[in-house]
Amino acid sequence: MNDATPEFDVQSLRTVRAIADTGSITAAAASLGYSQPAISQHLRRLEARLGVAIVERVGRGVRLTEAGRVLARHAPAVTHAFDAVAEELAELRGLRTGVVRLVAFPSASPVLVPRLLASLAASHPGLTLTYVEAEPPEAVEAIREDRADIALTFSYPGDRDDPHGSSARGLTVRSAGRDDLLLVLPAGHSGVESVSELAEQTWIAGCPRCRGHLLELCDRAGFDPRIGFETDNAVAVEGLVAQGLGVATLPRMAVDSFPTLPGVQTSPLPSAEARGLHIVTARDAERVPSVSTVLAVLGRELAAVAGARS
């Protein structure tokens, strides 16, 4: 080996990255499932191999040195490459095992994710899929920081060509279909031919970060919506509409995740708009057999859910 080539192991890199993410050795140990002495031992072994300090004391805590920050910055790419090697070797041995980390938006949780988990359990019992809910910006960040392997995300009309802006640069973003946007109106409403007919209504909207599509929709219809209630809970949205307190839009996936409440009716937007669904991974992630398997099953389940609606 070239004397200039540093010698380190994957677990040590994961340790350094965990310290960077959590800010302390104690928190890093908890996140990795190790004891604090074990983490300290990883660090001492790594520092001995490299001949440089990785952490330094600051008051009662620690922080990464410049060398530590270099390791933390490159750790996700290096550990992903090592994982890919291990997975491919396992595939050559005929093993169908591994852990794949999925992150997806909340409205995917009630229907799509359980179907995916059940399908994988039946077809690949040795494969473990972990799942965390997150909105698209956080999901993309999880991919970039190697805290997830697959992210299921969405984007609304107007940003579909580059669904997550510069945050997804260097990642792979695949189209995964569409999720129709529905008008949510009180039961018995005669319906509308244009959203402009609802200009005088009170609107129920999501959080400020989540309502951009509604504001754009109303702007194109020539009015600013009067937002009286703010919630990201689809059941709460329908509850407010059922009491005649306002109108709203919801994605079909959210509407289909629970029985429509009495007093509510839904219909596609007159403009037939939908949010785009996307699958985000690191570059070449599909070369890892377990990730490729989950991607294939996820694609089938997305198609099955879409087909059940038609």
Per-segment meaning from a language model:
Residues 154, 184-185, 195, 200-221, ...:
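Secondary-structure junction motif
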Residues 112, 264-310:
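A late-sequence structural motif
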Residues 47-69:
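A short LG(V/I)-centered, amphipathic sequence patch enriched
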Residues 162, 166-174, 179, 235-284:
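Beta-alpha-beta core module
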Residues 135-140, 144-148, 154, 209-265:
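Hydrophobic hinge/microswitch elements
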